[in-house]
Every structure is written in C-alpha cells, then in structure tokens.
C-alpha cells in the first residue's frame, strides 16, 4: 500500500487548525499536512506519529506558512523504526514578509528499536521577516540495553519491556487536547 496524501487547511483571523496524524502499516507513506496562516492571531498545530517496520518507509512531517502578523505554529513529530524500517521527518516553516511577531516551534523525535533501522530529519525554515521567534529541535535515540535490563530485572519479558519503552516514547499522543466545543 502506498499512502500518498495531501492535506491542507487555511486559517483566517483568530482561527486554529489542529492536525493529528498517525502513520502505520503502509509500505510507503508521504504525508505532510499543511496550514496556511492567513489571518492575524491564527494558529496551526500538527501532532504526527509514525511507526516503520520491516520494508516500510514512513516519510511524514508538516508545513506551516505564516502569511499574517501575530501567528503561531507548533509541530510535534514522533517516529519509531524497527526491523529495518525507515522513518523520516520532512517539514517546512515559512514566515513571509509582513508576518511580524510570528512564532513557531518544531520538535521531532525518533526512536530506533534496533541497529538496522534508520531515521532521517529534513527540516527547512524560511524566514523573510525580522521580528519572529523560531525554534527547532530534533533527537534520535536508540533503545538501550540498560533500559531493557532494568525492566527485565523487574520481572518483565523482553517484548513487554520493549513495548513499555515505545509507549513511553509516544506518550505525547495520549495527552493531546480534546476538541473544544
């Protein structure tokens, strides 16, 4: 299965768009939800979680375009790769001329479950305005033998210990906000 998706939204003044994105199971995923912040005080958020197993490439991320003043955006991307799977983050944050006092935060974290899996990060930031706040952070970590040893010494089997580590890594998804009514 090839999962090639285009998702776009525009936000006018005071509006908020929240993408919650999950990617699992397809051989190839290429998905980058986009938010165009066209009105003052609009906000875009993306929370993306991807799991890449054997023979899979999950290429996910987000695009935020700040086209008005006082806009804000947040991208949180979590990926897990195992069995030789490949997880990639590909994102764009663009602040156009005139979008002063805009702010953006990008955080992408990857967890490699074994030594044959791979993670890549391709961030792109294009700022054309002086008075903005921009932050980008990326981490790639590996499940350590110490983590597994600790949990196994507490009576867990290896599969159960690994599952607990992965669940802890993606715990941000369980604390995502509920829809506002």
Model-predicted segments: where are they?
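Conserved beta-strand/loop scaffold segments within soluble protein domains that form the structured core
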Residues: 1-156, 170-172, 180-181
